[in-house]
Curated annotation (Swiss-Prot):
One of its GO terms (cellular component) is membrane. It is a multi-pass membrane protein. It is found in: Membrane. The chain crosses the membrane at residues 59-79, 120-140, 148-168. Residues 12-21 have a biased composition (Polar residues). May be required for cell cycle progression. Residues 1-10 have a biased composition (Basic and acidic residues). Residues 1-21 are annotated as: Disordered. This is Uncharacterized membrane protein YPL257W. Keywords: Cell cycle, Membrane, Transmembrane, Transmembrane helix. It comes from Saccharomyces cerevisiae (strain ATCC 204508 / S288c). Residues 1-58, 141-147 are extracellular. Coiled coil: none annotated. Residues 80-119, 169-193 are cytoplasmic.
Length: 193
């Protein structure tokens, strides 16, 4: 390679190059975490309904399964938050640009209502996701196999839809936050000039 080509390559910022600066280990860890959380939320944990500690004390089983569902839901929030943040850092445009424009105008008119509504959506999504995962964990306590499989499929579809809503909300949250910060920086630069 010539010196001119090396100079042109070094001028490209890491965000413009994409995720090439990310190590293979980081990618592998992220994929393994995604697989573990997906498995934990879409399939029941056998130990929670077969171990004698949980079969003898159903109240303990309910508490442990609810705590398990809460931690798995936190894992989903970590996945979608990190993915939205990484997308924003790479400089990719938001997927929902028209919706973001309307939300940005709403945020300009009512900033406190917008923030409150967004956090309410996060809380409701977390609550619904936790309850759905909890129901998946409790599904094998019933006897009818066909009914259990049908309920499992319905609950898995509901979990997937809630995850789409969470991903969408994180993207809106981060893109609106970035749009406001960029606009504020532009106004500050005009004031100093």
């Amino acid at each position: 390679m010539t010196a001119h080509a090396n100079e042109r390559i070094s001028d490209v910022s890491p965000s413009a190059r994409g995720s090439s600066s990310e190590s293979k280990y980081d990618k592998l860890c992220r994929v393994l975490f995604f697989i573990a959380i997906t498995k934990s939320s879409f399939t029941p944990e056998h130990i929670l309904y077969k171990h004698s500690i949980f079969t003898d004390k159903p109240i303990l089983a309910d508490i442990v399964t609810f705590m398990y569902a809460a931690f798995v839901s936190i894992g989903w929030f970590l996945i979608w938050g990190e993915r939205a943040y990484r997308t924003q850092e790479m400089g990719q445009p938001p997927m929902y640009s028209n919706i973001n424009y309307h939300l940005l105008s709403f945020k300009k008119r009512h900033p406190k209502k917008f923030t409150c509504a967004l956090w309410l959506v996060f809380f409701l999504a977390y609550t619904v996701l936790t309850v759905l995962i909890w129901l998946v964990q409790l599904i094998f306590r019933k006897g009818n196999v066909f009914q259990m499989l049908l309920q499992l499929i319905i609950l898995d579809i509901a979990i997937a839809l809630v995850n789409v809503a969470i991903a969408f909300t994180f993207e809106i949250y981060l893109s609106q936050k970035a749009a406001i910060e960029i606009r504020d920086e532009g106004l500050n630069n005009l004031d100093t000039a």
